[in-house]
Curated annotation (Swiss-Prot):
Belongs to the class I-like SAM-binding methyltransferase superfamily. rRNA adenine N(6)-methyltransferase family. RsmA subfamily. The gene is rsmA. The lineage of its organism: Bacteria, Pseudomonadati, Pseudomonadota, Gammaproteobacteria, Pasteurellales. The keyword RNA-binding applies. It comes from Pasteurella multocida (strain Pm70). The keyword DNA repair does not apply. Specifically dimethylates two adjacent adenosines (A1518 and A1519) in the loop of a conserved hairpin near the 3'-end of 16S rRNA in the 30S particle. May play a critical role in biogenesis of 30S subunits. NCBIfam families: ksgA. Transmembrane segments: none annotated. HAMAP family: 16SrRNA_methyltr_A (MF_00607). It is found in: Cytoplasm. This is Ribosomal RNA small subunit methyltransferase A. Its EC number is 2.1.1.182.
Length: 288
């Protein structure tokens, strides 16, 4: 028996496909999303429809973004949902969700998008950060991710899980774990445990920075040398006196600072940039 085949479709490794089939888990996720009839829901990576079907039954319309041509075609001809599904066959990493928001006239309707999905684990982090660019257009997001990634997203200061990913995610969103999911809930079963997370974009950013490049840069430099004191880890960006003036304990390490601390450092760097600035780095690359 082919462990990679489910409902007549063979999982494709290049798309990171693991199909959810546990009904208890599916019910738990749909309950967490709590879709309402007239809301604008967008599913990323619907796959074989494990979440698409129960969510689609509860709403007037559902938009799905699917890269796999065969799966997109199956959804277009779904036996009872085809009339209420819009299938966008494209790479979600390249898709303009802001244009989708505008095309649906959601601002006029005083609505925002609700996004959910069982994300391919190999692109989950950059995909989330692509979506954060559209945080003003999104009401909330529910994603299936690796359990370790969810721990990092939800972590607080002074913990091993706390890192650059934590700070950048919580800068944009309130982050809450929803439920844990064992490998047996998927076909083929992944080699890691999974979990569902809820991300709710802040209506007003609690710690706004003037330039996201500098928030990413200072977090990257601090956490890439997380065993060093900040005095040493950030020595190419700040002098010891400057850190002290900014209220930073010179003996602290990267995991000891709050998001507010990092935002303060980033805003200082925006106003006082070092001479050797290279802004070609991308915010999406956030593996600690």
């Amino acid at each position: 028996m082919n462990s990679k085949k489910h409902l007549g479709h063979t999982a494709r490794k290049r798309f990171g496909q693991n199909f959810l089939h546990d009904n208890n888990v599916i019910h738990g996720i749909v309950s967490a999303i709590y879709p309402q009839k007239d809301q604008f829901l967008v599913e990323i990576g619907p796959g074989l429809g494990a979440l698409t079907e129960p969510v689609g039954e509860l709403v007037d319309h559902l938009t799905v973004v699917e890269l796999d041509r065969d799966l997109a075609e199956r959804l277009r001809h779904h036996p009872f949902l085809h009339h209420k599904i819009t299938v966008i066959e494209t790479d979600a990493m390249q898709f303009d969700f802001g244009q989708l928001y505008r095309d649906a006239n959601l601002a006029e309707k005083k609505q925002k998008m609700r996004v959910f999905g069982n994300l391919p684990y190999n692109i989950s982090t950059p995909l989330m950060f692509h979506l954060f660019k559209y945080h003003d257009c999104i009401q909330d997001m529910h994603f299936m991710l690796q359990k370790e990634v969810v721990k990092r997203l939800c972590a607080g200061p002074n913990s091993k899980a706390y890192g650059r990913l934590t700070i950048m995610a919580q800068y944009f969103c309130q982050v809450m774990p929803v439920l844990e999911v064992p490998p047996t809930a998927f076909k083929p079963a992944p080699k890691v445990d999974s979990a569902v997370v809820r991300l709710v974009p802040h209506k007003v950013l609690p710690h706004p920075v003037k330039d996201l490049y500098w928030l990413n840069r200072v977090c990257s430099q601090a956490f890439n040398q997380r065993r060093k004191t900040l005095r040493n880890a950030l020595s190419t960006l700040f002098s010891a006196d400057q850190l002290t003036e900014l209220g930073i304990d010179l003996t602290a390490r990267a995991e000891n600072l709050s998001i507010a601390d990092y935002a303060r450092l980033a805003n200082w760097l925006t106003d006082n940039p070092p001479a050797d600035v290279n802004k070609d780095e991308m915010i999406e690359h956030l593996d600690d």
